[in-house]
Every structure is written in C-alpha cells, then in structure tokens.
Amino acid sequence: MPVTVTRTTITTTSSSSTTVGSARALTQPLGLLRLLQLVSTCVAFSLVASVGAWTGPMGNWAMFTWCFCFAVTLIILIEELGGFQARFPLSWRNFPITFACYAALFCLSSSIIYPTTYVQFLPHGRSRDHAIAATTFSCVACLAYATEVAWTRARPGEITGYMATVPGLLKVFETFVACIIFAFISEPSLYQQRPALEWCVAVYAICFILAAVTVLLNLGDCTNMLPIPFPTFLSGLALLSVLLYATAIVLWPLYQFDQRYNSQPRRSMDPSCSRSYVQPNEVCNWDRRLAVSILTGINLLAYVSDLVYSTRLVFVKV
C-alpha cells in the first residue's frame, strides 16, 4: 500500500537515483536522464529560434514549453550538483516529480500541437526542416520526462512525498487538462447567456483552483496549515470534484449538440467551420465544443481515479 507524509523534515526523496551534492549525480541514471532532458529541450528551442519558426500562439506555446522546461531542469541539476536541496524554497520531496510530470505533459502537447497547427503549413525549406527536427527533440524530451516520473513515483510501502503518489500525479494531470479546457473555451460566445454552460465553466474553474491549491500546499510543505486533516481535505476535494464534473459531463454536450437547445449536432451545420472561414492555425467553434466534451470526460475519469486511490493512502508524520 502506498505511504505518504503530510509533513516532513527530510529534503531529498528516498528513491532518488542521484548522489546528492556531488558531480557523480550526473553519472547516475536519473542524472543522465536529466541531462537528456536538458539537451533535447535546448536543441528544440535553438532549432526553432535560429529560423524564427515560432510566430503565432501555437509557436509561442511550443517555444515557451521548451525554454521553461530547459530552465527548470537546469535549476534542478544545479541544486543536486551543489547539494543545495535544503536551501530550496519548495519541498524537494515533491518538486522534482511535480515538475517532471508537468514537463512531460507540456512537451507532449507541444509535440502534437506545434506540428499539426503550425509546421504543416510552413513552406518546404530550411525553416520547415528545423521545425520538424525540433518536434522530434520535443518528443524525446517528453519521453525523458515521462521516464523520470515512472522512475521516481511512489512504490507500495514506500515513504515519500504526496506528489509522488498516484493521487498527487493525478492532481497534476487534472490541472493540466483544465488549462487545455480553458484554452478551448476562451471564446465567450461558446457559453455566455446560457446558465447551464456558464455553470460548466464555473465547474472547470472551481475544480482547477482546488487541485492547484493542493499542489501548491504540497510544494510549499504547508499541508499542516489546513484547518482540517489533510486526508479529509483530499477525500472531500476528490468527491466534490467528481460530483461537479458529473454535472458538467451531462450539461455541456447536451446544451452544445442538442438541437432542442438551438445547438448544432453536426460539424457541417456550424458556419464557423466552413473552409472559407477557418484559418490554418485556428479551431472552429464546433471543434472547440467537441474537444471540451472529450476533455470533460477525461478529467471526470481522472477525478474518479483520484477518489479511489486517495482512500488507499496511509498518512504518517515524521
């Protein structure tokens, strides 16, 4: 049974494969993996920057992802090489794996969005070749970060930080999916002046905030500041999120695709999806509605899994 701590004075993960405060950290499996992450993200943004192939929102997102992941990975390597984990302002038990999970999801999204919405519309030539190569290195980075998550996640019977457990990793996934939902509903006309759809947007926002607060509490090692026991907080949060998303999974598709509510059940009925209207790197309204419906279902499954796994955790204080 997985074991986690609500508060700890230990600053390094017990499952770390690196030698803390030594150059040998770079020769251990986890250190070599982080070097691969560092190199692949650096090469990805360097290739794109050298030809300026990152204009527009999709290109900007990809460039931000690679630069951000490179910078934070470099900070983690410096911390471990210098043995500065005790001085790090965040919980070292929780920070590396939390970042690795976010980085894997960020790089995955860039590896999909960048080539499908940007690269394929570039003319053949040096810029396109560099963009394709950058996408390849983005995929490598995604695999490297996912491998780190697999290596450092909690094992049955192991004492570790909450973010290394399945519910902790699910919190990262839930917040990431919510951010994608927010991107798709950035067009207010999709839900304004329709109370049922506005309720769905409120659900996405409330659940995102609660999950993000959980992540921040663990990163700051502040779970003891809650007015209620942390396990109770987690169980209540997961149950509330499941109930809220259960309403959204019914209301959003119903009011977006049912003709009884003046919606378009087929893509061809939405004028914003006509070829003459949609720009190459834009998503039409019907596709946005469908994407949000799918992502709502995915996040509901994540919250259900979160609720189930949370009941299997044993919390101890050391």
UniProtKB/Swiss-Prot annotation:
Membrane topology summary: Multi-pass membrane protein
PROSITE patterns, A to Z: MARVEL (PS51225)
Cleaved signal peptide residues: none
Keywords: Membrane, Repeat, Transmembrane, Transmembrane helix
Domain MARVEL, chain residue ranges per copy: 25-157, 162-315
An example Gene Ontology CC term for this record: ruffle
Pfam name, any one: MARVEL
Compartments (UniProt record): Membrane
Primary localization: membrane
Transmembrane regions listed in the UniProt entry: 35-55, 58-78, 95-115, 131-151, 165-185, 197-217, 233-253, 290-310
A Gene Ontology BP annotation from the UniProt entry: protein localization to plasma membrane raft
The UniProt record lists the keyword Endoplasmic reticulum: no
PANTHER family: MYELOID-ASSOCIATED DIFFERENTIATION MARKER (PTHR17068:SF3), MYELOID-ASSOCIATED DIFFERENTIATION MARKER MYADM FAMILY MEMBER (PTHR17068)
Family: Belongs to the MAL family.
Protein's UniProt name: Myeloid-associated differentiation marker
